[in-house]
Amino acid sequence: MEKRWWKESIVYQIYPRSFKDSNGDGIGDLNGITEKMDYLKKLGVNVVWLSPVYQSPNDDNGYDISDYRAIMTEFGTMEDFDRMLAAAHEHGIKIVMDLVVNHTSDEHPWFIESRKSKDNPYRDYYIWRDGKDGKEPNNWGSCFSGPAWDYDEETDMYYLHLFSKKQPDLNWDNPKVREEVFDMMNWWLEKGVDGFRMDVISLISKQPDLPDGKPGINGYASFNEPANGPHVHEYLQEMREKVLNNADTITVGECSGVTLEEAKKYARSDEKELNMVFQFEHMDVDADADNKWTDKKMDLREMKAVLTKWQKGLEDIAWNSLFWENHDQPRSVSRYADDSAKYHDVSAKMLATCIHMMQGTPYVYQGEELGMTNVPFTSIDQFRDLDSINAYRELVEEQHVFTAEEMMRYLCCKSRDNARTPFQWDDSAYAGFSTVEPWIMVNPNYKEINAKKQIDDPESVFNYYRKLIALRKEKEIIVYGTYDLLLPESEEIYMYIRTLGEEKLLVVCNFSEKEVAVEIPEEFRKGSYLIANYPKGEIKEQMTIRPYEAFVLEK
């Protein structure tokens, strides 16, 4: 397998609004990131993926961009960005920009022009259609509730928005749109950024006839209906030729709804398109078929089957991204393990062991390395996330699918705002994130869970992450070894083997609070511990795996 720097990297995702406020306005900013570069260096990560910092009206927290070559005023200036970029590079950290080009803001100059008239030069930059029988052109739903179409009186037509009404979809079939996007990407590369995380990139090519899809719980087809459209690979290959080959970049595509076969096309080892994709099949293990709003717990057997499918399916063909968390997902220690005081630390370390020992590039979301947890929200008024607020309005107030109590329970489990509360730096007011009340509430457990408390504690979750990250840099087998699952039918234990030549590692993780007896494969019984989240027991044929225990044995 060809060795590449991005296969050996550890990526840290920063959600700037919630990372560090440097100027006392309650909102995180670029200077706050620059201020904390030493922290990132200490953790050991070598790439930072920055959620959008471009000019935006902030309908969807920066994923609605009105100017791709300007910085959102709340986050600072272009000079602040340049200073942050230089500081990152001085610390040996690369910067990856969030590229949001499936859609723009409705306040982008292109859309302002596009909606003026049917013959405007920018009309075809977006997807406009006539209505059908006085209704929307098809039954596609928006990711944020309601239809994916909005009627525009000015020209008596509908425009497509797979996300909010303020996020109209670009028409990638128009070569001028592609040229504009490629030109903008080259501009950022010339500035010195090191790559792109491509937001919902699998949605950019729509089927020309925009066919209806299967309706879900709210009567609309999924926003994912256009995923992996007819020209998506052609457009990404064009992007590779016109942009990505101009520099030694790292690229990852967010590919919601992607199949294994499609992923092989997006992230083939011949590097014609992207380096890797984010697939979300493992994020759907605890969802209902047609509804994500649930408090259903995952079945570990299904989780193992999904992750194993991707580990084996991409082996020697394409490259995996490894993650439990991002800005759109709840906190993993609350979701997949146990965030109670008794098991919090071992749970967070177990989850980290499980995912970081697989083949692929690991992504750590801010606060994950501390074991930050879901938030005990008590009222819909505490939420800031468009998705959560719209879903509450639609499913509770309008359609009465759920009661208010049910929906609050589901939001506390699944809302994106669980990941977006301020980073917990210390136990001072507002968790050391800001000197004033932040834009969203601070998780009340910040006095127990914070960076200051963990950095100097050798047994902390933070220092366990440091060890995992250091091991990945030191041991080629963790990056390049093959993966083989053991005990597929166990409901508690996730156990797998990594192999590279004569080297072998055994990874054992208990996803339950039970003590579980496990037989250790013979070849590891005379081995040694590489890492463990409990005091190390004697390695023998039969071992009792303690609640949320994780360890790695080296042959």
Predicted regions and their residues:
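Active-site and adjacent substrate-binding regions of carbohydrate-active enzymes
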Residues: M1-S528, A532-K555
